[in-house]
């Protein structure tokens, strides 16, 4: 009875899953992700797992009217992305920017944005 489900699960582990690593760039306690300061070491460790392929990094910036803070967070992410891309050729995605800040994110190198409510406005 469980055999087909088990067989399907085995197929998942045979394929390499492409993932983005979410980083916590903001000081906002409501934001999640791996701490930005330890990201390079963490991503280096993840390279050992053959069933995942790190394709890039992502973040959600601070939700604030302080545009300088948001730009600083995006620029830190972009700098890290360029460093990682040089070290790991498979990394090709920098995902940052949502409805409220996607224009700043693109200005600072984002090549993937996550727009929700702005589509309906």
Map each language-model feature to its residues.
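Single conserved hydrophobic/aromatic residue that forms the stacking wall/gate
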Residues: 1-13
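Active-site loop/helix belt of alpha/beta enzymes
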Residues: 25-119
């Amino acid at each position: 009875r469980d055999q087909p489900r088990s067989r399907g699960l085995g197929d998942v582990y045979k394929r390499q899953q492409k993932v983005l690593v979410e980083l916590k760039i903001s000081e906002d306690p409501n934001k999640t992700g791996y701490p930005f300061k330890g990201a390079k070491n963490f991503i280096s460790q993840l390279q050992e797992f053959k069933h995942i392929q790190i394709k890039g990094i992502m973040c959600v910036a601070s939700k604030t009217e302080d545009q300088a803070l948001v730009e600083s967070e995006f620029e830190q992410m972009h700098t890290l992305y360029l460093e990682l891309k040089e070290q790991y050729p498979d990394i090709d995605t920098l995902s940052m920017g949502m409805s409220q800040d996607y224009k700043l994110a693109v200005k600072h190198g984002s090549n993937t944005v996550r727009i929700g409510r702005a589509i309906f406005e």
